[in-house]
């Protein structure tokens, strides 16, 4: 028996301490203890639900912290996010394959050098997604797992992550796994990952996080401007003839991720300035006002910064950040490419 322990509960009493005192006092017929325990049960109900029987997220947050549930965000490397501070996080790499070498898309890969090499490479190239065991290993150690994958139309990553989630839940009692097909890649996926982190830090319960990230996803978008379509053609994403004509005429292709997750060509332009102008017009047409914008570039920092200034000229309150593509996005965006993820004006806040 632990001496000096008072048989009362306070708002700071931990769940473990409550259980210990139940075992210690319940069989003794301690009436004061029973009364305090009943008060604690009332506190739990009061914390979890309001007067109308609806879930009280703030109360759930307090009890969740007592239980010490471990949350983790898991993303494949197409999001160009390799680390995330202040929240459980894992990045599962995709791979770029050539006849001579395999490149694992981690933060250590020299993505600009890879993009430069691909400009003149004549051999076969392809990409491969993480398998089920890769995803399972990334989920390990978490009770609540939130996953964001590259669009299922480009990769099998989503299906593998989904199957891994089912296995993880079966082998880990009380674990829950939510898998979101971004229907996109790159900068838009990064927006989703960062919103997940904000929801977790806010102490939202699992079901609420899932519901709110789905709602947020309805208001995020991806644009891209590509100088070359060679690797997309090699992997069957566009017709080789289209890629050849674009290369010969020096055409830049402006496109977007469609609602179905396909890469959809919007227009073709000549010259960088025209391409950037069209991207700003597309963002305006889709409702960008003062939201967040992520610009990722492949060996084209000058164009990315120029686009940032053009966005601010039209939307002074927009929150614009510039980053670089990782290996997988560099492979598809190719040398000089830009990928832009942005929120529209109806994007919900945390």
Name the predicted role of every residue range.
Residues 5-6, 21, 43, 55, ...:
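Basic polycationic patches enriched in arginine
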Residues 7-10, 28-30:
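Intrinsic disorder/low-complexity segments
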Residues 1-9, 17-20:
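Polybasic, low-complexity intrinsically disordered segments
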Residues 101-170:
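Class I S-adenosyl-L-methionine
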Residues 66-71, 78-90, 94-95, 100-101, ...:
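Mixed-charge interfacial surface used for oligomerization/domain docking
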Residues 17-24, 31-50:
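Short, positively charged and aromatic/hydrophobic N-terminal segments
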Residues 24-29, 62-64, 68:
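Intrinsic disorder/low-complexity segments enriched in small, polar and charged residues
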């Amino acid at each position: 028996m632990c001496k000096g322990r008072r048989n009362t509960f306070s708002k700071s009493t931990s769940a473990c301490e409550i259980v210990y005192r139940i075992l210690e006092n319940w069989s003794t017929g301690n009436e004061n203890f029973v009364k305090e325990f009943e008060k604690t049960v009332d506190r739990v109900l009061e914390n979890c639900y309001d007067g109308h029987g609806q879930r009280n997220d703030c109360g759930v947050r307090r009890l969740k912290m007592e239980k010490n549930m471990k949350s983790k965000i898991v993303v494949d490397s197409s999001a160009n996010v390799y680390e995330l501070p202040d929240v459980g996080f894992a990045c599962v790499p995709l791979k770029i394959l050539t006849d001579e070498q395999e490149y694992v898309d981690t933060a250590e890969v020299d993505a600009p050098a890879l993009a430069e090499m691909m400009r003149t490479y004549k051999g076969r190239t392809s990409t491969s997604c993480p398998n089920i065991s890769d995803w399972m290993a990334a989920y390990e150690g978490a009770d609540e797992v939130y996953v964001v994958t590259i669009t299922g139309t480009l990769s099998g990553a989503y299906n593998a992550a989904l199957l891994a989630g089912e296995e993880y839940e079966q082998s880990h009692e009380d674990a829950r796994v939510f898998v979101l097909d971004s229907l996109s890649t790159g900068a838009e996926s990064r927006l989703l990952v960062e919103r997940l982190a904000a929801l977790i830090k806010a102490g939202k319960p699992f079901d609420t996080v899932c519901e709110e990230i789905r709602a947020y996803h309805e208001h995020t978008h991806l644009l891209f401007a590509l100088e070359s379509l060679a690797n997309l053609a090699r992997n069957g994403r566009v017709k080789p003839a289209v890629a050849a004509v674009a290369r010969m005429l020096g055409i830049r292709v402006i496109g977007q991720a469609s609602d179905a997750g396909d890469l959809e060509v919007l227009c073709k332009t000549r010259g960088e300035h025209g391409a950037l102008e069209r991207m700003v017009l597309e963002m305006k047409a889709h409702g960008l006002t003062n939201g967040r914008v992520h610009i990722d570039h492949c060996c084209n920092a000058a164009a990315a910064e120029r686009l940032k200034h053009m966005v601010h000229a039209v939307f002074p309150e927009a929150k614009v950040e510039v980053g670089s593509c990782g290996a997988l996005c560099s492979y598809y965006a190719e040398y000089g490419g830009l990928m832009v993820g942005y929120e529209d004006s109806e994007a919900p806040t945390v």
